[in-house]
Design a protein with these regions (language model features):
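Membrane-interface "cap" regions at the ends of multi-pass membrane proteins
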Residues: 92, 101-156, 162, 168-173, ...
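Select transmembrane alpha-helical segments in multipass membrane proteins
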Residues: 122-133, 197-210, 244-247, 302-315, ...
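Hydrophobic transmembrane alpha-helices that form the core helical bundles
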Residues: 148-152, 160, 169-248, 252-256, ...
Length: 548
């Protein structure tokens, strides 16, 4: 039996009722045994109202009562709304032979529709998106930044997080509307391409990818630093390089084999990290309430406007990462409904954790701004030695969880650029077995390893924070442009969108002008490389356009 010009030695019937309201019928692409072998194809019918899918096969076990009702209701709606199309579809499905059952290998089959255009598997749900964003935002920075913020703002440092929360929420609101208009992988790069064209998109893609590579490499450096507290030998050059290779290589291998595997690893580390932080917060506040002698007077600082801007820039770095989870939207189940909810839930959870940790640090440590390990030093004030060791180990879990989240979503930047012909085609290849952008994953892992081995945490952190501000500004500016280009788009609409756009640009612009010359030089060099990439793309496309 031939389907779409491709011969198949195993004939099967495949039909998919997709959106009965519009009467569109779309064939099922491939269903993947994620991480457990090649794609398998079967017939199923989808409920248009609940986006549920059930198998239809002569040799399958009988369907549960709920699924039988789903099938009957779907057929009833189809026959009422599009009787001629539905009749033709049912005739075709009855006439086509059904694929015989074959033994499935290993684990339970995950039934997910792939992205018809890219081949990526849509397995990331709403709460997995929340976990991914929280995991990305709460990296190792939460264990080091409280001291730096306290040095800038003193007793007003918890208030600083609320100010940063307002600014980041404005950016997130703009992203919620813009992101809900896209189903493909790519995140802010894709939004810039639709709004401003190829040149700005390539610039945005390079800056975003560079920001993530530098951030992940910096956290990998911190992981080695914290691990050195337990095993000092890892700080020497050769063991350090070996541990970094094992650290980055393992997560690359997990995500190479399947997005569901990477999704599970990311969720595991998010739960572990938030649980440890919750243990620290609950125990700390409980002890402070019962033992007032543990409390110290917060450090008093006469914060200037420059201090506030410096602290806010670091807080933007601390919140950074929520936008990167949108890069994996090509594998999200429902971008229009899930992304806006996931964004604000994740930012709310992150703000609560940051503020709570900051309060504990400044009220338990004298001169908190001078501490190198503020969370561990704070834990020593109210926890037994075993508890302090648990918190120290939590630092390693937090750092490694941050790496796992970024290894899942950041490779999709180059993947999206390649699929849109803004990068070499080989980067956009999807693995024939695991259905993952394996080339992009390998490139990202190699870049992270090189940055981690060759540079320091400070250099990587500065580079990441500066690049991220430009990405945020581009997304805010894209909101009114996309509204004008797609006035009837089926997307989340932000009330007072123009006001949010203005506030987002004002927030990012105010921080950009506070950057130092060295940071701007790095951004200028990155922009120059992106411009060369754009010129290469134009040169590659010129012959094909002339032929046409």
């Amino acid at each position: 039996m031939a389907i779409d010009g491709r011969s198949s030695s195993k004939p099967f019937s495949r039909f998919y009722l997709n959106s009965f309201e519009e009467g569109r019928v779309t064939r099922l692409e491939k269903v993947s045994l994620v991480g457990h072998g090649p794609p398998h194809e079967k017939s199923y019918i989808s409920d248009a109202t609940k986006n549920k899918s059930v198998w239809l096969s002569e040799k399958e076990p009988s369907l549960p009562r709920y699924q039988r009702l789903v099938v009957l209701r779907s057929l009833f709606h189809a026959l009422l709304l599009r009787p001629r199309r539905s009749f033709a579809l049912l005739c075709y499905s009855c006439a086509a032979p059904t694929r015989t059952n074959s033994k499935m290998c290993g684990a339970q089959l995950q039934i997910e529709q792939t992205n018809a255009s890219s081949g990526l598997v849509r397995v990331i749900g709403r709460w997995s998106l929340v976990a991914l964003m929280v995991n990305t935002m709460i990296g190792a920075s939460i264990f080091g930044l409280p001291a730096v913020i306290a040095a800038y703002l003193g007793k007003w440092s918890p208030t600083g997080y609320f100010v940063a929360f307002v600014g980041i929420s404005v950016i997130a609101a703009c992203m919620a509307e813009v992101a809900s208009q896209f189903q493909e992988a790519g995140g802010p790069y894709l939004y810039a391409r639709a709004a401003f064209g190829r040149l700005v998109a390539i610039q945005n893609g390079w800056l975003l990818w560079l920001a993530r590579v530098a951030a992940v490499a910096g956290v990998a450096n911190l992981f080695i630093t914290y691990l050195g507290e337990f095993f000092p030998i890892v700080k020497t050059p050769l063991p350090r390089a070996g541990i970094l290779a094992a650290l980055i290589g393992f997560l690359a291998a997990v995500n190479y084999r399947g997005v569901a595997g990477g999704n599970r690893v990311s969720n595991f580390f998010t739960i572990a990290k938030v649980s440890l932080l919750s243990f620290f917060i609950v125990t700390g506040f409980f002890r402070l309430l019962l033992h007032s002698d543990l409390r110290v007077t917060p450090q008093s600082v006469n914060a200037t406007a420059s201090d506030w801007f410096g602290a806010l820039l670091l807080m933007v770095y601390a919140y950074g990462g929520f936008e990167s989870a949108l890069i994996a939207s090509g594998e999200a189940r429902d971008t229009r409904q899930d992304i806006p909810v996931a964004l604000f839930v994740a930012i709310g959870i992150t703000t609560f954790l940051y503020v709570a940790v900051q309060i504990l640090v400044i009220y338990t440590i004298q001169n908190a701004g001078t501490s190198e390990t503020p969370v561990v030093d704070s834990a020593r004030r109210f926890l037994a030695p075993l508890g302090v060791q648990i918190i120290a180990a939590g630092t390693l879990v937090s750092a490694y969880g941050y790496l796992s989240a970024n290894m899942l979503h950041t490779p999709r930047i180059l993947f999206a650029m390649s699929r849109l012909r803004d990068f070499p085609a080989i980067v956009g290849k999807v693995h024939p077995v695991f259905r993952t952008p394996h080339i992009s994953i390998l490139i990202f892992a190699a870049a992270v390893y090189l940055f981690a081995v060759a540079a320091t945490f400070r250099w990587n952190a500065i580079l990441s924070g500066v690049a991220r501000l430009f990405v945020y500004g581009t997304v805010a500016a894209a909101l009114p442009v996309l509204r004008k280009k797609q006035p009837t788009a089926d997307a989340f609409r932000l009330p007072f969108g123009w006001l949010f756009c203005f506030l987002g640009l004002l927030f990012t612009g105010a921080l950009v002008v506070r950057m130092h010359r060295g940071e701007l030089i790095v951004i200028a060099l990155t922009s120059a490389v992106a411009t060369l990439n754009w010129l290469w793309v134009r040169r590659q496309q010129a012959p094909s356009e002339a032929t046409n």
